[in-house]
Curated annotation (Swiss-Prot):
It comes from Staphylococcus aureus (strain MRSA252). It is an enzyme of class 1 (oxidoreductase). GO terms for molecular function: NADP binding; shikimate 3-dehydrogenase (NADP+) activity. It catalyses: shikimate + NADP(+) = 3-dehydroshikimate + NADPH + H(+). Keywords: Amino-acid biosynthesis, Aromatic amino acid biosynthesis, NADP, Oxidoreductase. Shikimate binds at S13, L14, S15, T60, N85, D100, Y211. This is Shikimate dehydrogenase (NADP(+)). The keyword Oxidoreductase applies. InterPro entries: Aminoacid_DH-like_N_sf, NAD(P)-bd_dom_sf, SDH_C, Shikimate_DH, Shikimate_DH-bd_N, Shikimate_DH_fam, Shikm_DH/Glu-tRNA_Rdtase. The gene is aroE.
Length: 268
């Protein structure tokens, strides 16, 4: 079977390394490549994919929303998130999914077993935040709290959550067991501070969905304060494993995928 990841730029993507490691571990001769498709060429997506004879593909920045009009069906989780990161091509039909939310939550559950009873604060109200919130809301008992700079961002949400400003989030930080940053603050080249951690409880798990850099500024600050931290590496691996399951109906080798990504990160 043939797969790919599509984005612009895409040369930095670790998806090919991760998926190929999984194929090798499982003894599969499947292929996975990176395809750079600029925004101005995106209208040719059907033609490009058809020529490549792909069975499915991942889609990343800046095309996660742009792909939706080209799909024959969109899964509920992708509709909720307002973005697609996985496409299955079956019987000529394109079916869109979003595995980011379930990928993050599966990883988080592995390091925080009592997740269903946790009081959780999510920073940011974009697509990634929404996907994670919808997944958490399926089983977490306390009502989720989501903080954003502007309240207008919540107009597209139809989830029963506490909506607060970032300023209020700073005041009430001590009340949360887990704080999850889903904003771009802290990504490579972005040292913007999203929130002041002065009131962070020492028992709170601080998380960020970014894994490059391995420790974002907010994670470094929390670690200096003595908090446990959790980055986005597992989210990346588990979302990839979920994509593989959608394409092949097989379980991925999580360990081989994570090892391959870690080796690549250490080599950079």
């Amino acid at each position: 079977m043939k797969f790919a990841v599509i984005g612009n730029p895409i040369s930095h993507s670790l998806s090919p390394v991760m998926h190929r490691a999984n194929f090798n571990s499982l003894g599969l001769d499947d292929t996975y490549e990176a395809l750079n498709i600029p925004i101005e060429d995106f209208h040719l997506i059907k033609e490009i994919i058809s020529k490549k004879e792909l069975d499915g593909f991942n889609i990343t920045i800046p095309h996660k929303e742009r792909i939706i009009p080209y799909l024959d069906h969109v899964d509920e989780q992708a509709i909720n998130a307002g973005a697609v990161n996985t496409v299955l091509i079956k019987d000529g039909k394109w079916i869109g999914y979003n595995t980011d939310g379930i990928g993050y939550v599966k990883g988080l559950h592995s390091v925080y077993p009592d997740l269903e009873n946790a009081y959780i604060l999510i920073l940011g109200a974009g697509g990634a935040s929404k996907g994670i919130a919808y997944e958490l809301a399926k089983f977490v008992k306390p009502k989720l709290t989501v903080a954003n700079r502007t309240m207008a961002r919540f107009e597209s949400w139809n989830l029963n959550i506490n909506q607060i400003s970032l300023a209020d989030a700073e005041k009430y930080l001590a009340e949360f067991d887990i704080v999850i940053n889903t904003t771009p603050a802290g990504m490579a080249g972005n040292n913007e501070s999203i929130i002041n951690l002065k009131h962070l409880s020492p028992n709170t798990l601080m998380s960020d969905i970014v894994y490059i850099p391995y420790k974002t500024p907010i994670l470094e600050e929390a670690e200096r304060k003595g908090n446990h931290i959790y980055n986005g590496l597992d989210m990346f691996v588990y979302q990839g494993a979920e994509s593989f399951k959608i394409w092949t109906n097989k379980d991925a080798d999580i360990n081989s995928m994570k090892t391959a990504v870690l080796q690549q990160l250490k080599g950079e």
